[in-house]
Every structure is written in structure tokens, then in C-alpha cells.
């Protein structure tokens, strides 16, 4: 065969092969490449969404942690205030109780002192009566002297 005819036949076969490839082989390959590109794009978009969701979740967690810390610090401050208030109330109550006990003790002491004075007055009156009786045995008027001693007792 002639080189020109062979070259011409090869060109026809080449263009036939190009046409066949473009008509039947290339569309499924292009479709597969497009699908693969779409999947990759979807994956990248999902990764980007995941990243932004993760960042938002991190921000929310940080906000919740800060809020939790604030609440805990408020609770601690309130507990400290309550404890200080309870201690102060206990001090005031103890102080008032001590004052009440001291006043009661003072009243008891005064009452006991009054009783002791009355007892001493009675004893002094009895001793005075006995002394006067022994001195004035001859002239004893018990009722008259008792009245005098009662007035004396009242004056003491």
C-alpha cells in the first residue's frame, strides 16, 4: 500500500476513534468527574459547615462556662454574705442573752441582798428585844416594846 493511502486510512481511523470516544466514552467519564467534583465540593462545604458549627459550639460552651462561673461566684458570695449575717445574728443574740443573764443575776443579787437585810433587821430586833428584856426585866410591857421595835426595825 501506498504511504499516502496508509496515512489517509490512519487519519480516518484516528478521527473515527476520536468521534467514538467523544460520543460514547467521554460523556460517562465527564459525568463521573463532575459527580466526583460535586461530592468533593459537598464534602468541602460540609467540612466548612462543620468547622463553623464547631466554632459556634465552642463559643456557646465558652459562654455557658462563663455564665456558670458567674453563677458559682454569685452563689459563693451569697453564701458568704449569709454566713456573715448568721454569725452577726448569733453575736447579737449571744450579746443580748448575756445582757439578759447579767440583768437577771443583778436582780437576783439585789433580791438576795434585800432578803439578807430583812433577815438582819429581824435578828437585830430580836437581839435588841433580848438585850432590852434582860436590862428591863422589872418593867416589861411586851406589846408596847414590840411596837417600838417594829418602828425601829422599819427605820433600819
Swiss-Prot record:
Any matching Pfam family: ATP-synt_B
UniProt keyword list = ATP synthesis, Cell inner membrane, Cell membrane, CF(0), Hydrogen ion transport, Ion transport, Membrane, Transmembrane, Transmembrane helix, Transport
Which cell locations does it reside in?
Answer: Cell inner membrane
- Gene Ontology CC annotation, any one: proton-transporting ATP synthase complex
Q: Where are the transmembrane segments?
A: 7-27
Q: How does it sit in the membrane?
A: Single-pass membrane protein
Q: Which GO terms describe its molecular function?
A: proton-transporting ATP synthase activity, rotational mechanism; proton-transporting ATPase activity, rotational mechanism
Recorded family membership: Belongs to the ATPase B chain family.
Subunit comment? F-type ATPases have 2 components, F(1) - the catalytic core - and F(0) - the membrane proton channel. F(1) has five subunits: alpha(3), beta(3), gamma(1), delta(1), epsilon(1). F(0) has three main subunits: a(1), b(2) and c(10-14). The alpha and beta chains form an alternating ring which encloses part of the gamma chain. F(1) is attached to F(0) by a central stalk formed by the gamma and epsilon chains, while a peripheral stalk is formed by the delta and b chains.
Briefly state the protein's biological role.
F(1)F(0) ATP synthase produces ATP from ADP in the presence of a proton or sodium gradient. F-type ATPases consist of two structural domains, F(1) containing the extramembraneous catalytic core and F(0) containing the membrane proton channel, linked together by a central stalk and a peripheral stalk. During catalysis, ATP synthesis in the catalytic domain of F(1) is coupled via a rotary mechanism of the central stalk subunits to proton translocation.
Please report the name of this protein according to its UniProt entry.
ATP synthase subunit b
The organism named in the record is Neisseria gonorrhoeae (strain ATCC 700825 / FA 1090)
